[in-house]
């Protein structure tokens, strides 16, 4: 393994976190953590052993008993300290994230900040977790409900947002009174470990956040472990479908955000500069590795005249190392890069035109990086591979239609429904679009319509499995269960004998 001259993480082999202790795994199988800009191995990530995973989940269950009885005010105080520590360490976290994932430092800071916003929102848990009360539903009888934690929960995280996605999960779960067993992506485990380290410093008790590592074996363990009541997952469709099926079969709640094909609709009355810049930034930023990237542009009517200018602007963007002054970084793996290139090439053979071609881009100072340049593919039809599959690379697929109705029909026929945007100066068009389109997140003149944590990250159709969404009020609902109490404190109970009839609440006795 390559020795780093200026390490930003203290270990070469990533450790498990069990019972508040970072411990070396006894694994026999390890995954290389590779800097995608240089091709260098920067750490080894273990496939945690069955004994280690079982110890982690049993410890989580034991620790949660006391934590659930900790006052919500004291749990919130831990989160207040946690958000402070994240802010104080934000530059170091961004550097770790950039080294293992490849995105630019500015984008890494944005990744972290959007997760930090969720941490801040958990500091309202006293309000978010409130139940309901109705007095005198019947004579001397009150009914009230409150939310209780589930117990042990689990989070399975993707590679593309090493900070934001874990922070969507464990801060909400534990502030609601649960414990969480976290499994970061084996490609980018270092950011999660730093976030876990800061959580311990903030006062999260030992065992309330445990971290294990691995691939399929770790996923299967999480799906099968009887102590785990709920699973949160963000990632690709194949894995998400599998986790949802296996987890729910075992009686667990599962929320899974899956793939996407997000369309950006450009109306002829849109602000041209804003629309074109938004398309380029959303599709090319983060090397296109965002589940909310506007990877598909739909130009309506005369707006198609702007396509050459779109291509000209996109051609000026250059990939490079994230810790340099680059427009965007590398793909996460060579396999991901090769797949993106294949989808473009196959579509070109079917008649698509590659106006901006990033397939052969190189970065001379880092020849082993997973480089692909900005690409714009036009004359695309809905039957081409670059449209039917999520490229998840810095490529913008361009289609044209005659009317807004045509654009909406195209979007609604696509199996995915993660998000979409429209660029227009017409309130009538915007309102029609937001009402008729079938997507979880809708932007109006907004390129990446990811909602702030006062709301929830939603989705539609093949982009989601499970019916309760991430963070916000729905996130709290996912990690809690409702208990309803009906109490009768009649000052003078009457001896009317036993009755076999169903009591009629609301009828004064």
PLM regions: where:
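Conserved C-terminal structural/oligomerization subdomain of aldehyde/semialdehyde dehydrogenase
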Residues: 38-44, 204, 228, 265, ...
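ALDH superfamily catalytic-core signature
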Residues: 238-381, 404, 410, 444, ...
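Hydrophobic face of amphipathic alpha-helices that form TPR/SEL1-like repeat modules
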Residues: 2-37, 359
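Short, well-ordered beta-strand elements within core beta-sheets of diverse protein domains
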Residues: 42-48, 63-69, 155, 264-267, ...
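Rossmann-like NAD(P) dinucleotide-binding subdomain of oxidoreductase/dehydrogenase enzymes
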Residues: 131-276, 325, 401, 466
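Residue-level signal for inorganic ion chemistry
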Residues: 39, 75, 97, 119, ...
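Structural signal for hydrophobic packing residues in well-ordered secondary-structure cores
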Residues: 64, 68, 83-90, 94, ...
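Glycine-rich loop-to-alpha-helix module at the N-terminal edge of alpha/beta enzyme cores
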Residues: 40-130, 140
